[in-house]
Design a protein with these regions (language model features):
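Acidic, low-complexity, intrinsically disordered peripheral segments
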Residues: 2-8, 20-27, 82-84, 88, ...
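N-terminal signal peptide c-region/cleavage motif recognized by signal peptidases
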Residues: 16-17
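Regulatory alphaC helix of protein kinase catalytic domains
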Residues: 25-39
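A small-residue-enriched
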Residues: 40-130, 162, 243, 268-342, ...
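Sec/SRP-type N-terminal targeting helices
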Residues: 50-54, 67-68, 112-117, 129-157, ...
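Periplasmic alpha-helical coiled-coil/stalk elements that build and connect Gram-negative outer-membrane
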Residues: 157-270, 372-375, 379-382, 399, ...
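A short glycine-centered flexible hinge/capping loop motif at secondary-structure junctions
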Residues: 199-203, 404-408, 445
Length: 451
């Protein structure tokens, strides 16, 4: 079943309707927009889509930050200090022996150990060794978070696109109902006029005249309700697409084609393999697995780093002004009151939770696909029924118009038949768009973006 082939019927149904959403007599020219353009605008300007994109960027930068831990780090440590006092060293005369029979030193001396103002500066390069194992696990966690954020962003994109489709269809349906209601009002007014004349000549009861008046007012009330609904839908569509809320829109009734769906079981398998929600859940499992490995590594593997340092000092005793230092640094917690093991148990619980959530999401996706598939089949059947109803209403209206020309039918009867045909057209349009909407929901359930 193709939507494009139904565009003429949509246009014919809407020709007497408002057509332009949100337009007032003094408003600017409406903006013509197609369904595809509305979806593109929403994906470009919608706040939820933009927020999801920023979340992906955030996780990507977090991954880059974790990756940088693989490489050596260089940092400088400098100090300027003022001492209140220093230790003095006294060397007595002759304490160092004699030189050519004379005591050395010849007299006692008092030496100061350095100055009271100290300057020290060191630049050190550090390369993690055993910590690389922990860094790898941290990078696995960051990579899983990136995957999850991308899947969630895709899910947000699918939801926003589906919402645009639903509101777009709702506007077209409301416009069709607007036309049908106007036709009903005209028919009710004709009946009311005839009843008034019949009451004057005694051919009808006054109660029938009152009833026809009530029907006319009820139709006008429905028209006002439809107008209010159109206004609300226009605001919602503008909000979804990122347009100013007061933008008047002229919606293109041609909404593309419905593609043939895959067999039911094949659809379920495809959805489980590619649905963004399942992919996000799988990424959470990968993240939890990496977190468990990191916790185990943190328990058993000490932190070993290789470092090299170049230092400069002034007034620090017993050190050269410039010197280098090279070595290995090892750090290991001998006792932490069970903290690391508790963290490991926490990560294992999170892993179990992530696996259970994956199973839950998989079941939910299968349910969504089955439900959407059933709805697609039902709406297709409803579409066929609506087509038959329209054919009968069209034939009835044709007969009534011919009888009106021959004088065998009243004007109100012909107007009622026309109104019923308009209602049948609106019903068919609603069935068509319900079928299209069901297909879009099916596409979303499969994990794809409705176009």
């Amino acid at each position: 079943m193709k939507r494009k082939a139904l565009a003429l019927l949509v246009a014919a149904t809407l020709w007497t309707s408002p057509g332009v959403v949100g337009q007032t007599p003094n408003s600017a020219a409406p903006r013509h927009i197609t369904l595809h353009e509305a979806v593109e605008l929403a994906l470009k300007h919608n706040h939820d889509v933009r927020l999801a994109g920023f979340s992906v960027d955030e996780k990507q930068h977090a991954k880059e930050a974790e990756k940088s831990s693989y490489f050596p780090s260089i940092h400088n440590d400098s100090n300027l200090a003022r001492l209140t006092d220093t230790q003095l060293i006294q060397i007595n005369a002759g304490s160092l022996g004699t030189v050519n029979g004379a005591p050395f030193p010849a007299e006692s001396s008092i030496l100061n150990q350095g100055g009271r103002t100290l300057t020290a500066s060191g630049t050190q390069i550090t390369q993690p060794l055993t910590s690389l194992l922990k860094i790898r696990r941290a990078n696995d966690i960051a990579e899983a978070e990136v995957k999850a954020s991308r899947s969630k962003a895709q899910l947000t994109t699918n939801d926003v696109a589906l919402a645009v489709h639903e509101v777009y269809y709702a506007v077209l349906i409301a416009q069709a109902h607007h036309s049908a209601t106007e036709a009903r009002i005209q028919a009710a007014q004709d009946i009311e006029s005839e009843r008034v004349q019949q009451v004057k000549f005694g051919a009808s009861l006054e109660q029938e005249s009152i009833e026809s008046r009530a029907n006319s007012l009820q139709a006008q009330q429905e028209l006002l309700t439809t107008d209010l609904q159109l206004t609300d839908l226009q605001l919602k569509l503008n909000d979804l697409t990122g347009l100013p809320l007061n933008t008047a829109l002229d919606l293109d009734p041609s909404v593309g084609e419905v593609q043939e769906s895959c067999p039911r079981e094949e659809c379920v398998v495809t959805a489980k393999n590619s649905h963004p929600e399942i992919q996000a859940a799988r990424a959470e499992v990968e993240k939890a697995v990496a977190a468990v490995r990191l916790a185990k590594t943190d328990i058993w593997v000490p932190d070993v780093d290789a470092f090299g340092r170049y230092s400069y000092q002034n007034n620090v005793p017993f050190l050269a002004r410039n010197f280098g230092t090279f070595g290995i640094h090892l750090s290991y917690d001998l006792f932490d009151a069970g903290h690391k093991h508790a963290v490991l148990h926490e990560r294992e619980s999170q892993l179990s939770e992530a696996k259970e959530n994956l199973a839950k999401v998989s079941d939910e996706v299968e349910l969504q696909v089955q439900t959407a598939y059933n709805k697609l089949e039902r709406t297709q059947q409803m579409l066929k029924v609506s087509e038959e109803i329209l054919a009968l209403r069209h034939e009835s209206n044709r007969v009534q118009q011919q009888e009106l020309l021959r004088g065998a039918a009243l004007k109100s009867q012909a107007a009622t038949a026309s109104a019923q045909e308009f209602e049948a057209k609106a019903l068919l349009l609603q069935s068509q768009l319900d079928y299209a909407r069901a297909h879009d929901e099916f596409v979303r359930a499969m994990g794809a973006t409705p176009e």
